Amino acid sequence: MFFAVDAAIGGGISIADETADGNLMVKPFKLALAQSPGELAGPRARVDWLAATLSGIAKQKADLLVLPEMFLSGYYIGDAVHDRAEAADGPFAREIAALAARFGIAVLYGFAERADGLIYSAAQCFGPDGARLGGHRKLAIPPGFETGTYTAGAGCRLFELGGVKIAILICYDSEFTEPMRHVAGLGAELVAVPTALSAEWDWVARTMLPTRAYENGLFLAYANHAGHENGLDYLGASFIAAPDGRELARAGSGPEVLLAEIDPARVAAARARLPYLKDRKGLKLDAG
């Protein structure tokens, strides 16, 4: 095994194997998504659950595990969020970073971030060496209990893992066309969407978000909770979608781990076949 440059993914460095005939075979990027139980208690129980889950998927050689919105703290927890919020480098964050390094799997998870006296609905990713690769603060705060509790974030950034360019959007962010289109324009090939979607919003997970993958020509990992939390019924229905909008994996309503191999070359192929991102620039929207 050795390192080779893969032109199909924009010159990024990928681990490649040599086949019997001497050709290069790029190591596939294996994506895991965990639909975690909503009934889990506080951060301690959730980190313990994560450790057990990572132990299981390590056997599958996963490169990245995506977890739901507010995985660490719990989502529908009322005023308890003030006690469970922590800094991006807080004690539980350090434990999660250590787990990522222990199992050699990048971990992307949602949490309540405390910074400068404010609380954000945030997500961050630790790489397989435990180093922080990137993070995101929820841009759009929906009506309801989140308003007045969380401060809206600003900006979207990409990070790279295994030759794949990754962006994070959180739940409601992804329901607007603009953020998804923005990160696609930045070059995102995979968008991770930690979410906390209740059962009444079924069509968002089954129709709207696969369409976001299709219209932007990218992979999309939508990670929801399962079961119940303090009277809130989660939909489940987490999924991984390809750049053509097709489902690579779809969860039911209970706790589940999804696995899919993603090939960034499919992003370029999808965007060439239906060049929405390029052709939209020529649209004349003003009448004058």
What are these regions (language model features)?
Residues 13-24:
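Short, Lys/Arg-enriched N-terminal segments with co-localized hydrophobic residues
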Residues 2-3:
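Aromatic (phenylalanine/tyrosine) cluster motif
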Residues 26-31:
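Extreme N-terminal starter segment of soluble prokaryotic enzymes
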Residues 88-108, 175-258:
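CN hydrolase (nitrilase-like) catalytic-core segments centered on the catalytic cysteine
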Residues 40-128, 198-218:
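Cys-nucleophile CN-hydrolase/nitrilase-fold catalytic domain and related Cys-dependent amidase chemistry
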Residues 88, 114-189, 198-207, 269, ...:
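Active-site catalytic loop in hydrolytic enzyme cores
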Residues 109-111, 122-125, 157, 238-240, ...:
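Short beta-strand scaffold segments in enzyme catalytic cores
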Residues 73, 124, 136-142, 239, ...:
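Short beta->alpha transition motifs characteristic of CBS
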